[in-house]
A protein has these predicted regions:
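Membrane-proximal helix-turn-helix segments that form the acceptor-binding/catalytic region
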Residues: 70-78, 92, 112, 123-144
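Nucleotide-sugar-dependent
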Residues: 18, 207-210, 258, 262-267, ...
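Short N-terminal targeting/anchoring amphipathic segment
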Residues: 73-91, 102-105
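N-terminal subdomain of nucleotide-sugar transferases
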Residues: 1-47, 217-225
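Conserved donor-binding/catalytic core segment of Leloir-type glycosyltransferases
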Residues: 5-7, 194-210, 216-219
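A charged, aromatic-enriched C-terminal amphipathic alpha-helix characteristic of glycosyltransferases
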Residues: 19-22, 321-361
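Donor nucleotide-sugar binding/catalytic pocket of nucleotide-sugar-dependent glycosyltransferases
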Residues: 133, 137-181
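Nucleotide-activated donor-binding/catalytic signature segment of Leloir-type glycosyltransferases, i.e.
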Residues: 240-273
Length: 361
């Protein structure tokens, strides 16, 4: 049995919630015939080394302290030919360990130094930039979520152009399903949606980068009597507070709900337009938002602030700008958008990463 060493927090049970955990879990499934060792490194935590065994001995999980267990880390790195690092965040703690003569794979996840700079942490961004360059010099394989991400890093580090780049977005399949017409009709009746209503949807939370306040402002500004707005969020209280602060007219028709991922599909299936307002930034250009792909799959036409989000733009997705007169929009779905979603989601299965790592160095 082949062996691989992952630097990541192994997601167990109900911890498989956020995007990072879902991706780690999904990649792990591609190595189900390998023995996997997971290392989680703490700076102030794990004073005592923790060890857990799962999957009938096929998975070893270690939680260690960077300073107290440095010898253990040295030996376990030396023992493994294949090393897989989930995100630059996990490599930062390995900066002073030599990974030469190993087959190193970096799952990029996102543009971490740029994310830190965007968040205002310029010092930490500079440190991560040094780490990133060193890792790109050392690693052999790079997992990207989009072609845009691949192109960005090859432009940033031209010396990597001959290395192995694999495009591998991870999209949840929870809401990728056909919805029966009778279920759609039942939901419309429940919500009070009329036959001639144009349905707008927002699916997301209240983080600043999701621009939910701007979304609500746009909904209110361009609303007409036959517009119905659905806001799906895990932060009902936060969205309600924003809505109340903007004091929409009584004629403004909307609902705010929190639903399970498996219930998203039926709401998407009755919507014509979906808000996804992202700022113009490299973080968004190289991304592959699950929400956008879900919108496209159901033929929803995205309402955008910045149109170059991931590979959807280069594939020619149908969209409208949030500054257009949205009051003029009519009922409409896009077959082209669904085709694009199928192309993008197929990248999940047409490249099994473990097949690229068969040769020991």
């Amino acid at each position: 049995m082949k062996n691989i060493l992952f630097f990541a927090t192994y997601p167990i049970g109900d911890k498989i919630i956020d995007g990072m955990a879902q991706r780690i879990h999904s990649i792990d499934e591609e190595f189900d015939r390998w023995h996997r060792t997971y290392i989680e490194i703490g700076l102030k935590t794990f004073i005592k080394k923790e060890h857990e065994v799962l999957d009938d001995g096929r998975i070893d999980i270690y939680r260690v302290n960077l300073f107290l267990h440095v010898i253990f880390l040295y030996h376990i790195i030396k023992k493994h030919s294949h090393i897989y690092i989930h995100s630059l965040h996990n490599y930062f703690k390995l900066y002073f360990f030599s990974l030469r003569h190993h087959n190193v794979t970096l799952d990029i996840h996102g543009t971490v130094p740029e994310e830190m700079a965007f968040a205002g942490s310029r010092f930490f961004s500079s440190l991560l930039s040094f780490s990133e360059k060193k890792l790109f010099q050392t690693a052999s394989n790079f997992i990207c979520v989009s072609e845009e991400m691949k192109d960005y890093y090859i432009e940033k580090y031209p010396f990597c152009s001959t290395k192995n780049f694999i495009i591998k977005p991870i999209f949840s399949q929870n809401s990728f399903s056909e919805v029966q017409p009778e279920k759609q009709l039942a939901l419309k009746n429940e919500l009070g949606i009329q036959e001639d209503d144009v349905v707008f949807i927002y699916s997301g939370n209240t983080q600043r980068w999701q621009n939910v306040e701007l979304t609500i402002q746009s909904m209110i500004k361009y609303s007409v009597p036959n517009h119905f707005h659905i806001l799906l969020t895990g932060d009902i209280k936060g969205v309600k507070k924003m809505m109340e602060a903007m004091s929409p007219e009584k004629t403004f028709r909307y609902i705010i709900r929190s639903v399970a991922p498996t219930e998203l599909g039926i709401f998407y299936s009755i919507a014509h337009y979906g808000y996804i307002l992202r700022d113009e930034h490299v973080l968004n250009r190289v991304a592959a938002p699950t929400k956008l792909i879900e919108y496209l799959y159901y033929g929803i036409i995205p309402i955008v602030k910045y149109e170059r989000i991931g590979d959807s733009f280069r594939l020619g997705y149908v969209h409208v700008n949030y500054q257009d007169d949205l009051s003029l929009l009519t009922q409409r779905k896009s077959d082209k958008n669904k085709e694009i979603a199928l192309v993008l989601s197929s990248r999940n299965s047409d490249k099994k990463i473990s097949n690229y790592l068969q040769t020991d160095l």
